[in-house]
Amino acid sequence: MSAGKAQIGKPAPEFQAKAVMPGGEFKDIKLADYRGKYVVFFFYPLDFTFVCPTEIIAFSDRAEEFRKINCELIAASVDSHFCHLAWTNTSRKEGGLGSMKIPLVADTKRTISQDYGVLKEDEGISFRGLFIIDDKGILRQITINDLPVGRSVDETLRLVQAFQHTDKFGEVCPAGWKPGSDTIKPDISKSKEYFSKQKA
């Protein structure tokens, strides 16, 4: 599968852009800065909208859970870094983000959105794209939602854990797999070990 220049199993498109960091400062960040860590890179349409703060706050509030498994979260939209800062300086009760634990990338030229295949050309905003990039910079997962529906932090965390498990042990993860659940050995005879435990 691919989206723009982003292809599963290939290096994720590199980017460099200004971001609002968790402390409120502006910083130029690039994907290469995160090599050696997993990255969940997700796009949202616009600041000061309706579904977007619920998603970003949900991810930010659980950033430590991702960091504990060597994974960083990065959010991006086509808004400027000044707009991002104003949104973080607006209280959550007023539709703002409040204090953030993750960087917000300003894709004002829309090149990152184009490279990742999430740009809604007619409106100049990003669809809700989410990309899981592994510690070697390889793209492992792509999800793109239409504008009205937000994403699940639980499912994103589960997917990162599953990819990390397969990377470490070489086994494959069945539907709904969670840490501690049985995996499948990718071998015709050895896989029967898993399937023999399933209900008839």
Swiss-Prot record:
Record-linked Gene3D superfamilies: Glutaredoxin (3.40.30.10)
GO biological process: one example: leukocyte activation
Keywords from the named record: Antioxidant, Disulfide bond, Oxidoreductase, Peroxidase, Redox-active center
CDD domains the UniProt entry points to: PRX_Typ2cys
Active-site feature positions: 52
Chain segments annotated as coiled-coil in the UniProt record: none
The keyword Disulfide bond belongs to this UniProt entry's keyword annotation: yes
Residue stretches making up the Thioredoxin domain: 6-165
Protein EC: 1.11.1.24
PROSITE patterns, per the entry: THIOREDOXIN_2
Cellular component, GO annotation: cytosol
Keyword Disulfide bond included in the entry's annotation: yes
InterPro entries the record matches: AhpC/TSA (IPR000866), Peroxiredoxin (IPR050217), Peroxiredoxin_AhpC-typ (IPR024706), Peroxiredoxin_C (IPR019479), Thioredoxin-like_sf (IPR036249), Thioredoxin_domain (IPR013766)
Catalytic activity: a hydroperoxide + [thioredoxin]-dithiol = an alcohol + [thioredoxin]-disulfide + H2O
An MF annotation (GO) of this entry: thioredoxin peroxidase activity
Protein family membership: Belongs to the peroxiredoxin family. AhpC/Prx1 subfamily.
Subunit (UniProt): Homodimer; disulfide-linked, upon oxidation.
Job description of the protein: Thiol-specific peroxidase that catalyzes the reduction of hydrogen peroxide and organic hydroperoxides to water and alcohols, respectively. Plays a role in cell protection against oxidative stress by detoxifying peroxides and as sensor of hydrogen peroxide-mediated signaling events.
PANTHER family reported in the protein's UniProt record: PEROXIREDOXIN-1, THIOREDOXIN PEROXIDASE
Further facts: The active site is a conserved redox-active cysteine residue, the peroxidatic cysteine (C(P)), which makes the nucleophilic attack on the peroxide substrate. The peroxide oxidizes the C(P)-SH to cysteine sulfenic acid (C(P)-SOH), which then reacts with another cysteine residue, the resolving cysteine (C(R)), to form a disulfide bridge. The disulfide is subsequently reduced by an appropriate electron donor to complete the catalytic cycle. In this typical 2-Cys peroxiredoxin, C(R) is provided by the other dimeric subunit to form an intersubunit disulfide.
Protein name: Peroxiredoxin
